[in-house]
Amino acid sequence: MEISEKAPAKLNLSLDTPFRHQDGEPEWRMVMTAIDLSDYVHIKTIPNSKEITVQTNTGFLPCDQRNLAYQAAKLLQSKLDKPEGVEIEIDKHIPVSAGMGGGSADAAAVLRGLNKIWNLNMSREELAKLALTIDSDVPFCVYSEPALVTGRGEKITPIGPLPPMWLVIAKPQASVSTPTILRQIHEQHLNHQEVQNVVSAIKQQDFDKMCRHMGNALEPITMKKCPDIIKIKDKMLQFGADAAQMSGSGPTVFGISQKKSRATHIYNSLRGFCKEVYLVRALDSLTTK
């Protein structure tokens, strides 16, 4: 059998890590949303086989056990002792190593797809619990709707649709290693973020309040490795964005505007500065067009 799954990118409207657990893993408090910039993951099961293969349309990704989509297929195959191999083909559109959860989105798509093909009838909560063993962003990507994400990434609380807005996304040429950034958390004095205020603003559909309280505690760390982040933020604000910040561990920056005309102006103005620029909207759910 075969199936195709949409794998939307994610953005962090607010990101804080208040402490580390004893095993060194960060505790997260984040407000996340999926956006309509997506990879497309095509999944085919092969009877009487245990082989898992991954193909992509880019040379920048590993196609072996290091690929999160591979790990997702292996996880379900092993846990359920399924006598079927899995062929995965990923049509990449999400920038790689950008802080937008592309690999996690692909892994979540594989979990959702195999859940359907194999008639597992696992709930989102069950899939998200499994997903945490792959990467901390995969549980959110199973949901792919606006949510408060806490714990190690496994506690997903949907918070309803965002206020109407447009998002302009720009990725600097540099790429950033998430593990490298996370290793420096304990070495830095982080500016802790008002995550709950962002949640309240979204529930109240208060766009201005949301903009005032947005923030990313990892931004100062990544900026030291990628100074273009501050340049892009400044340009977005100069061109009319209501707010601008880095997503995840970076280096991607996004700006938001309530008006499509202003967002389009920001998008056009940045295209000469960055090679990868996108004009997108947030997704209320995986079925949002």
Swiss-Prot record:
Keywords associated with the record: ATP-binding, Isoprene biosynthesis, Kinase, Nucleotide-binding, Transferase
Entry-linked SUPFAM superfamilies: GHMP Kinase, C-terminal domain, Ribosomal protein S5 domain 2-like
Gene Ontology BP, a term: terpenoid biosynthetic process
Keyword Magnesium among UniProt keywords: no
Listed pathway(s): Isoprenoid biosynthesis; isopentenyl diphosphate biosynthesis via DXP pathway; isopentenyl diphosphate from 1-deoxy-D-xylulose 5-phosphate: step 3/6
Molecular-function annotations in GO: 4-(cytidine 5'-diphospho)-2-C-methyl-D-erythritol kinase activity; ATP binding
Catalytic activity reported: 4-CDP-2-C-methyl-D-erythritol + ATP = 4-CDP-2-C-methyl-D-erythritol 2-phosphate + ADP + H(+)
Transmembrane spans: none
Entry annotation: catalytic residues: K10, D137
EC number: 2.7.1.148
Binding site for ATP: P95, V96, S97, A98, G99, M100, G101, G102, G103, S104, A105
Pfam families: GHMP_kinases_C (PF08544), GHMP_kinases_N (PF00288)
Lineage top rank: taxon: Bacteria
Tagged with keyword ATP-binding: yes
InterPro entries in the cross-refs: GHMP_kinase_C_dom, GHMP_kinase_C_sf, GHMP_kinase_N_dom, IspE, Ribosomal_Su5_D2-typ_SF, Ribsml_uS5_D2-typ_fold_subgr
NCBIfam families: ispE
Function field: Catalyzes the phosphorylation of the position 2 hydroxy group of 4-diphosphocytidyl-2C-methyl-D-erythritol.
Family assignment from sequence similarity: Belongs to the GHMP kinase family. IspE subfamily.
Name of this protein: 4-diphosphocytidyl-2-C-methyl-D-erythritol kinase
Top-level taxonomy: Bacteria, Bacillati, Bacillota, Bacilli, Lactobacillales
Gene name of the encoded protein: ispE
